[in-house]
Amino acid sequence: MAIKKNNFEEQLNELQEIVNKLESGNVPLEDALSEFQAGVKLSRELEKKLNDAEQTVAKLVDKDGNEKALDPQNASAPEEE
């Protein structure tokens, strides 16, 4: 299965389709290995997107849930307390 560059939700749906196909047990071994590899790759891409989103939120919100004012010069690094 070719992995397309889609948005998060589309990739998550694609991963779920792979999981469902593999769980059905009706996939030849070679196809199952190919699907598994595609699923692992998708999983890693999704994890990276989630980590990136988490870092973005951490830059915008402090530990108490209050919005931070971003310093454009330091926008790439969250403040440490």
Curated annotation (Swiss-Prot):
GO terms for cellular component: cytosol; exodeoxyribonuclease VII complex. The keyword Nuclease applies. InterPro entries: Exonuc_VII_S, Exonuc_VII_ssu_sf. It is found in: Cytoplasm. Belongs to the XseB family. Bidirectionally degrades single-stranded DNA into large acid-insoluble oligonucleotides, which are then degraded further into small acid-soluble oligonucleotides. HAMAP family: Exonuc_7_S. Keywords: Cytoplasm, Exonuclease, Hydrolase, Nuclease. One of its GO terms (biological process) is DNA catabolic process. It catalyses: Exonucleolytic cleavage in either 5'- to 3'- or 3'- to 5'-direction to yield nucleoside 5'-phosphates. Its EC number is 3.1.11.6. Residues 60-81 are annotated as: Disordered. Its main location: cytoplasm. GO terms for molecular function: exodeoxyribonuclease VII activity. Heterooligomer composed of large and small subunits. This is Exodeoxyribonuclease 7 small subunit. Pfam families: Exonuc_VII_S (PF02609). Gene3D superfamilies: Exonuclease VII, small subunit (1.10.287.1040). Residues 60-70 have a biased composition (Basic and acidic residues).
